[in-house]
């Protein structure tokens, strides 16, 4: 078996393990979202309050720290394992110590400034006539903000395992979180039923504590599940505070561009969240943040099942090629992952476009959500247009990260974020229709990735001359020709 064939077999095997865990986790996540829609609806103020409180900490983590952990640390750990005499053990100990301290400080600051943070994401809710709903949102946000720390620890442990080629645990652990969350909403349904959101009133204090506290508990459980796997992988952590002159400076130098990258994404996310918040601040029901997030949840499912798993398996291998100076190997790994991903995701994007109505009706059209599921269908159709360029862009960026290059992704993100912001403002502001706000914002998101992938391909090809361009276009064209007739029928 050639090295290329072995690499392909290894990539497929690792992807299968991760995809199976991701599939179970995403299915349970969808069940959770369906239960939320059944209990609280899709466009009510109660469901908006819960989702703003619960998703803002997650968004902050993924944008402020998650990108650094996912895309900077793995290549750095692989480099340390390859070159350090102790196999990278001391380096990883220092990485964990430094990031846990930083995450702890960040969590304290964000929790103390919760009113300011939440006003950045949902300014329309600070209006005087929304005072009761704003107070309910803040209570839930205070309870949810500690999730930021536990998300950080979870992803940090997960990346240590990934760098040791132990990919499965990180993809399977979120199942525990979803089980806890489903149990919490089942308890809420048993106590208060599914009519509370229709009253237009904010959550009571016990309701807020149950839902927000349950969400935070789920993240804690998800993190604890990883600890036995870390021990089984032969890793034992020892805090190390001798951080100077140990190579961490290089890691944080690489990470600074990722901080800029995520800062741009954060600003656009805030803009989108604020535009979405207007849908339910002006009326009791509209296609706001929850509709946008639920459509995104369905849209991202095929990407999460395949592309994320492919990229996670690809990154350590591509990083090893990059460390060895083998740019052809990096190009081959990227191309292999891209062809595998698009072979499945282009048909998936067409299917989402055609089947948006029945899929969203089945998932979110029951109970309290029966009257407003169609908002999600419209947003899902808008998202579906951008699935393929989003996937290609995602894999292209991993090639840059494997080559220890985070500066170029930051510069490329300027174009994507700028296009997203401009399109969001152009599509959201001129029309005063609260039922289509989420769909217009989703379309803006999709259009921005067409801009991004076009620019990124030419920039990456300068560094990887063997990266195919015309062959990729022909591959996509053949897939489209094979898929469209089936969709029409």
Please name every model-derived segment.
Residues 1-489:
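Membrane-embedded alpha-helical bundles of multi-pass transporters/translocases
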